[in-house]
């Protein structure tokens, strides 16, 4: 049986900048730089200027920006036990964020060791420090990759009762089928109450 998935219709949104956070997920050399060992290619090349422009608009409006960086140690169980592809090794060029989207001095960086930006990280503490509260806070999730770390972030913020926005032109993956699977999940019964599919040019801030 063949199941076809379509891209969701992007919605226009108006967000209060003071309650809005732009999350830029794992824009690291390994996947986002042409010299990276696991470079995603054209899909990631396209999103870099879009994220940069959205970031500038959010900063100018008074919103906040947070970055995540996914790193691994050589002896991580993911490699030692489960034999996954060794990647994103801490301290290497591949794990560094790309020059075009490096954090500004006032943009926090959350270092994580799995797809999940909440698991054993400072994310919860940072949200408390920023006074970005469940039920009130607006989180725009961008970056790579759509089916893995972006999906984990969207689900994590949704189950913590934040308003989540996914500009579909600001995430990338190396497999369009998996992009559509992620977007289908975000618009399913379990998440559509708090997740809005949008596009970067349809996000207005006040």
Where are these regions (language model features)?
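Short Asp/Glu-rich motifs
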Residues: 70, 77-78, 176-177
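Active-site loop signature of alpha/beta-hydrolase-fold enzymes
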Residues: 30, 73-74, 173
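Generic enzyme active-site microenvironment
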Residues: 24, 68, 167
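Active-site-adjacent betaalpha module
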Residues: 1-21, 57, 85-206
């Amino acid at each position: 049986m063949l199941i076809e998935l379509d891209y969701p219709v992007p919605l226009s949104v108006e967000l209060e900048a003071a309650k809005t956070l732009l999350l830029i997920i794992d824009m690291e050399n390994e996947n986002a730089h042409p010299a990276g060992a696991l470079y995603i290619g054209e899909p990631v090349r396209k999103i870099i200027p879009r994220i940069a422009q959205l970031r500038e608009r959010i900063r100018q409006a008074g919103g906040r920006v947070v970055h995540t960086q996914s790193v691994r140690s050589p002896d991580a169980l993911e490699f030692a036990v489960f034999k996954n592809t060794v990647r994103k090794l801490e301290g290497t060029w591949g794990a560094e964020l790309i020059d075009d989207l490096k954090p500004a001095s006032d943009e926090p960086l959350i270092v994580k060791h799995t797809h999940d930006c909440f698991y054993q990280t400072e994310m919860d503490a940072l949200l408390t420090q920023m006074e970005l509260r469940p039920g009130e806070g607006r989180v725009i999730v961008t970056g790579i990759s759509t089916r893995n770390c972006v999906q984990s972030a969207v689900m994590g913020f949704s189950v913590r009762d934040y308003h989540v926005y996914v500009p579909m032109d600001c995430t990338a993956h190396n497999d369009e089928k998996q992009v559509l699977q992620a977007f289908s999940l975000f618009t399913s019964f379990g998440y559509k109450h708090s997740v809005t599919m949008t596009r970067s040019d349809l996000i207005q801030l006040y």
